[in-house]
């Protein structure tokens, strides 16, 4: 094998925790190599060592047989290592050309920025990728997929021979993900070695050649994709056989009261009119393609965005939800799609995040907070939702994706919200944590909570939801329940708009 990268005996500790112990990883030139493991398995730490962001306590890095010691990210880049982070490192108001050459602009013999030469070079890079990018448009005006391609182009412009792709499909549509896979296959043909990090096992089998699995900071195994299956990979990642990750659906009570009724919701003046109802103890799925209006509908209901007209009843009482504060007072909570930027203050502790929108509950005097009472409540809700952390004072930024999501849920339970809107609740979460989130959702509905679940994961919609409202172009095309909820039926309504069910509340 033509080995381009070899990591041997990599060990790394942080105060109070051993993040990596004797890790081995070998990458062959021109292969796509998956790095798998639950959140907290050590994948990010290992990649940060490869990129020079962290230095190992022990072990060696070899590129093309030569030992390397990276003391900075620039050292790694100079050695041919590039990374496309899950959170983009682009400047939104700059165009693609300026983002590609930021900090290393090409100049004329007189020291002036040579925009024309940089533009030609950028065009050549995107031609190599086979993508069409408006070179003069600010990045913020491009689609998420196009921004992803700019990130990849930026790494290639630095002559990356080893490319790390960290959850690159997390915010892409299926069609955009397929385009990305085509680009990866072309780069593979050109001899670029890629390390692909993803929680979507179907993507691993679609595009990767080999897989290395980490668990609890330790090396588990490396295997060819053709020699394994999903069940074996899951067992290697979690250390046990994972039964069906979806809890059994309970028998739906026919007389369950409607806790949220939305009538005549019209977001735009000339847009479609939608109606739906949510009952106590159920999970109502919002399914459809990206851009079909699922999230937009939820945000309009709680007043986070304007609606041309809407009528809402909460537990049978008319409610004027003009803004999220009104929704909060009505007992409606939102777990937003982007938990890190919209759902959490990641620099705050777990305690501060959980009590953030309910500080009045802990006021002991006019301006003082009862910290002991706050701590007791925080411990209680952390236990109820299963947050795993050293203490209530742990900074949320240090938690895994699954535990961060549980902190958001804990905040709403602390506020006694009984209607919860989960927008892409398992995005960026490993298989074990997904099963925990699913179990928690069923525990909540068993206690009478009502949940709207917005998800682009079709198996999630089918496996978790008691009823499903399928969206297409802003309209609820069908409301499915029981045996009607299957992948083919959902996708038929989402793509073809076949109206097999009513638009009225079920």
Curated annotation (Swiss-Prot):
Organism taxonomic ancestry: Bacteria, Pseudomonadati, Pseudomonadota, Betaproteobacteria, Burkholderiales
GO CC field: plasma membrane
Localization in the cell: Cell inner membrane
Family: Belongs to the ABC transporter superfamily. Ribose importer (TC 3.A.1.2.1) family.
Cysteine pairs bridged by disulfides in the record: none
Gene Ontology MF: a single term: ATP binding
Residues annotated for ATP binding in this entry: 37-44
PANTHER family named among the record's database cross-references: CARBOHYDRATE TRANSPORT ATP-BINDING PROTEIN MG119-RELATED, D-ALLOSE IMPORT ATP-BINDING PROTEIN ALSA-RELATED
Subunit structure as annotated in this protein's UniProt entry: The complex is composed of an ATP-binding protein (RbsA), two transmembrane proteins (RbsC) and a solute-binding protein (RbsB).
Catalytic activity: D-ribose(out) + ATP + H2O = D-ribose(in) + ADP + phosphate + H(+)
Protein's membrane topology: Peripheral membrane protein
UniProt keyword annotations, A-Z: ATP-binding, Cell inner membrane, Cell membrane, Membrane, Nucleotide-binding, Repeat, Sugar transport, Translocase, Transport
Keyword field contains Lipid biosynthesis: no
Name by which UniProt lists this protein: Ribose import ATP-binding protein RbsA 2
ABC transporter domain span: 5-241, 251-498
Protein's job: Part of the ABC transporter complex RbsABC involved in ribose import. Responsible for energy coupling to the transport system.
């Amino acid at each position: 094998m033509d080995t381009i990268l070899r990591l041997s005996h990599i060990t790394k500790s942080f105060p109070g925790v051993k993040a990596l112990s004797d890790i081995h990883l070998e990458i062959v030139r021109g292969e796509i190599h998956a790095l798998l493991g639950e959140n907290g398995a050590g994948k990010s730490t290992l990649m940060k060592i490869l990129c020079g962001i962290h230095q190992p306590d022990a072990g060696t890095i070899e590129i093309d047989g030569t030992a390397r010691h990276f003391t900075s990210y620039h050292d790694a880049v100079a050695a041919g290592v590039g990374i496309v982070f899950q959170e983009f490192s682009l400047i939104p108001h700059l165009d693609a050309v300026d983002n590609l050459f930021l900090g290393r602009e090409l100049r004329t013999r007189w020291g002036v920025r040579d925009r024309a030469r940089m533009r030609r070079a950028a065009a050549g890079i995107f031609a190599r990728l086979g993508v069409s990018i408006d070179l003069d448009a600010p990045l913020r005006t491009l689609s998420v997929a196009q921004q992803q391609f700019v990130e990849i182009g930026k790494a290639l412009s630095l002559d990356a021979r080893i490319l790390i792709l960290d959850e690159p499909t997390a915010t892409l549509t299926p069609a955009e993900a397929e385009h990305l896979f085509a680009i990866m296959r072309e780069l593979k043909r050109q001899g670029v070695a890629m390390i692909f990090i993803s929680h979507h096992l179907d993507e691993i089998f679609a595009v990767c050649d080999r897989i290395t699995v980490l668990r609890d900071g330790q090396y588990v195994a490396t295997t060819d994709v053709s020699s394994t299956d999903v069940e074996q990979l899951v067992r290697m990642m979690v250390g046990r056989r994972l039964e069906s990750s979806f809890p059994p659906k309970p028998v739906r009570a026919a007389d369950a009261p409607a806790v949220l009724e939305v009538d005549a919701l019209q977001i735009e003046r000339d847009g479609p009119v939608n109606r739906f109802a949510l009952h106590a103890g159920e999970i109502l799925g919002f399914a459809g393609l990206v851009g079909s209006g699922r999230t937009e509908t939820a945000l309009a209901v709680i007043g986070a965005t304007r609606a041309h007209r809407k009528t809402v009843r909460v537990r049978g009482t008319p409610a004027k939800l003009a803004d999220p504060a009104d929704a909060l007072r009505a007992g409606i909570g939102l777990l937003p799609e982007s938990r890190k930027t919209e759902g959490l203050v990641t620099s705050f502790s777990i305690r501060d995040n959980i009590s953030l929108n309910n500080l009045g509950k802990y006021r002991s005097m006019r301006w003082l907070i009862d910290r002991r009472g706050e701590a007791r409540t925080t411990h209680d809700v952390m236990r109820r939702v299963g947050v795993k952390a050293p203490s209530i004072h742990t900074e949320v930024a240090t938690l895994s994706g699954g535990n961060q999501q549980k902190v958001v849920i804990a905040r709403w339970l602390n506020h006694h919200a009984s209607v919860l809107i989960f927008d892409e609740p398992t995005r960026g979460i490993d298989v074990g944590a997904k099963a925990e989130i699913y179990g928690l959702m069923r525990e909540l509905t068993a206690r009478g909570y009502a949940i709207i679940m917005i998800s682009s994961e079709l198996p999630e919609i089918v496996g978790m939801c008691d009823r499903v409202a399928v969206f297409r172009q802003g309209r609820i095309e069908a409301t499915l329940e029981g045996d009607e909820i299957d992948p083919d039926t959902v996708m038929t309504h989402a793509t073809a708009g076949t109206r097999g069910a009513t638009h009225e509340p079920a």
